[in-house]
Swiss-Prot record:
Biased amino acid composition, Basic and acidic residues: 382-392
Record field: compositional bias (Polar residues): 495-510
Keyword GTP-binding annotated: no
SUPFAM superfamilies reported in the protein's UniProt record: Cysteine proteinases
Segments forming domain USP: 80-375
UniProt name for this protein: Inactive ubiquitin carboxyl-terminal hydrolase 17-like protein 8
Pfam family, any one: UCH
Listed PANTHER family: INACTIVE UBIQUITIN CARBOXYL-TERMINAL HYDROLASE 17-LIKE PROTEIN 4-RELATED, UBIQUITIN CARBOXYL-TERMINAL HYDROLASE
Amino acid sequence: MEDDSLYLGGEWQFNHFSKLTSPRPDAAFAEIQRTSLPEKSPLSSETRVDLCDDLAPVARQLAPREKLPLSSRRPAAVGAGLQNMGNTCYLNASLQCLTYTPPLANYMLSREHSQTCQRPKCCMLCTMQAHITWALHSPGHVIQPSQALAAGFHRGKQEDAHEFLMFTVDAMKKACLPGHKQVDHHSKDTTLIHQIFGGCWRSQIKCLHCHGISDTFDPYLDIALDIQAAQSVKQALEQLVKPEELNGENAYPCGLCLQRAPASNTLTLHTSAKVLILVLKRFCDVTGNKLAKNVQYPECLDMQPYMSQQNTGPLVYVLYAVLVHAGWSCHNGYYFSYVKAQEGQWYKMDDAEVTACSITSVLSQQAYVLFYIQKSEWERHSESVSRGREPRALGAEDTDRPATQGELKRDHPCLQVPELDEHLVERATEESTLDHWKFPQEQNKMKPEFNVRKVEGTLPPNVLVIHQSKYKCGMKNHHPEQQSSLLNLSSMNSTDQESMNTGTLASLQGRTRRSKGKNKHSKRSLLVCQ
């Protein structure tokens, strides 16, 4: 827990822990053994809708479809608590939610990425693999998160947990791209990270004069929900997909009948994510003040009513993690999280404290970020645990001590733990920093006068246009404290800045957030003749 009194004059408390007192598999400084890839694990056969492959050809598929480990590699019991290094509760809460994301954890523990990673510098996937491995194999203990996880983001004060969450997910997505830096945007949406967290929006405009239809498709990694007028997540989702009427001054300039005509604008989910991240917009864009209201969220959520394709049966998601902010502003207070362990028990993860709790307690929080997983995926992972498929069965002795360095080397031979490399600590961050990450986000903000659903140009009848979204190119002034990072370590490479467009992201003006409920970071254009 932490508040303004813990800012310690902006001091970054990782500085006091630069020399580790116990061995850990810190992937930021680990030398990854380049070994052959193990046999491919069985792939999931269930899919909802092809991930926009019907929209445009994919020049290069970076990961086979549904390439997610089917059998669980996670220990059934809850893992370690995380040490607060000084105003890092936002980081700890976010990491715990990611650690207990079943498909991500299973992929990390499979070691598939680190065995073939070609990045010469810090890699976020390797760093997260080391963290998740260490956390899940250290029940009953407290571990220290790697400095590299916050490099380029932490500025010595409390940050926004959702921003850090998407910063990390984006960095992992970028880490899937080495060797494919010139891939098109369609191919970038085939990474394993996108297959776990990603889906696709469909924005459909129907001209009420000529009945022409314009469809715009955009990938997403999380969904932001406006809760100003909503009392529940269900109500917020209903508001998000409610058809919008375009008439009068907002009449639609139809590219088919070449008239400004009344139209209906409908937003739906074209493809569903395996893991659904729902962000409740609790903070005021201008002041940062918190909207402290109770918003009901269910343990099971049916997303079928919000899909483009109807009458295909329920699409049920189950809750497995909740990220909570306690306080009255995004500038103070503290973060903690609730996670569901593999055996089904819920735990409150409050920095170093790990406490078992009931689902009633979980559902009574003023949640900030909700994590859902498709029910079929959760059941698949749970069944594999009950069959004892994890690589190492944690016995009674595992609850009394953390995994040793030797055990981790035995179970995860791709990780080695040399001493801290001083030149890594002193290296200038030519890689991605928070400012670098936010720059393309500002470029991608939509112009106020631009309608993303507008079909431009004169086209023949019976034409479906999937057009390229347009964005604002300006960038707001940086805050002085954002000009440099207090950590000179960085966890990812900053080349190919275009690929760093994910989620509902903060601008450089404090904690401002996109007013739209969906994420716009695609650049795709396709003309389909019916």
